[in-house]
Amino acid sequence: MHTITPTEALTRDLTPATIVDQVVAPEPPTKESTALHVTRRELNVLEGHRARITGRLLENGRPGSPGLMVVLQRRAARRWLTVVRSHTRGGGRFAINYLARTPRSESVRVRFPGDELASSSTRRVGRLNVFRAVEASWYGGGGSLACGGELTSSTLGVANKILPCGTLVDIRYGGRSVTVPVIDRGPFVAGREFDLTEATKDALGFAGTGVVWSTR
């Protein structure tokens, strides 16, 4: 489109109203608002298995179009990193499957990046906990802890031979989960990686020795 300059307007004897009529472009269309709704989440998984998130994308409060991209992002090093992409099906429904390979515990979210017709939207999902299976036992009886302090029946924590003192460990057993620090050294039995304190054992419903899931 050629824009009429004031000089040209004088030359052509055009009125100001005529100039405005020729240079005003149509306003761009307003983008549709969007929202993500999560209907199911499976975020506690063993390494080598898939985390799964299902939901629906809405556009202006109505089921979204098929074929729109929805991504899963994890929080790492103060940034959100996209780890897997999916696309909506009929009714704006989406399903994201993420193969979890490395033990970790991180915040995750789903995001619709937006396009030329619809605005972007984001929904926090929770924490993705990727576990590995480890042998564990429990101990009690009081005494001094290698990381400082005294062991009591209410002390929450674990003993480990190599993790630094204070390292937080997410442990899952029988559908229960706790996050506790490394407070002691041990266990000193071949094949075992963690000794749970009595309070940690009770919180998990763990008895004797056996396999627990750990994010470390």
Where are these predicted regions, by residue range?
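Secreted/periplasmic proteins
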Residues: 2-30, 38, 44-46, 54, ...
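Nuclease and nuclease-like effector domains acting on nucleic acids or nucleotide cofactors
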Residues: 34
